[in-house]
UniProtKB/Swiss-Prot annotation:
Domain of life: Eukaryota
SUPFAM superfamilies given in the database record: L35p-like
Subcellular location as annotated: Plastid, Chloroplast
Name this polypeptide is given: Large ribosomal subunit protein bL35c
Record-linked NCBIfam families: rpmI_bact
Main localization (coarse): plastid
Family membership: Belongs to the bacterial ribosomal protein bL35 family.
GO biological process: translation
Basic residues bias (residue ranges): 25-44
Gene3D superfamilies: 4.10.410.60
Recorded GO CC terms: chloroplast; large ribosomal subunit
Pfam families: Ribosomal_L35p
Amino acid sequence: MPKLKTSKAIAKRFKVSSSGKFLRHKASKSHLLQKKSSKQRRHLSSTCSVDLKDIKNIAMQLPYL
């Protein structure tokens, strides 16, 4: 049986926590930041966990994480 390939695009965007959850960065933090409040920018910089509906698809593309 051949080796499974890891999707490099997915591997760059998601990390696995020590408890096994997938973590992601929030969107809307790359540009047009001047109109956003500092509170909004601060909350966008934190990580959050992936929704339960998306975990199966991400786990299939990251077989060795």
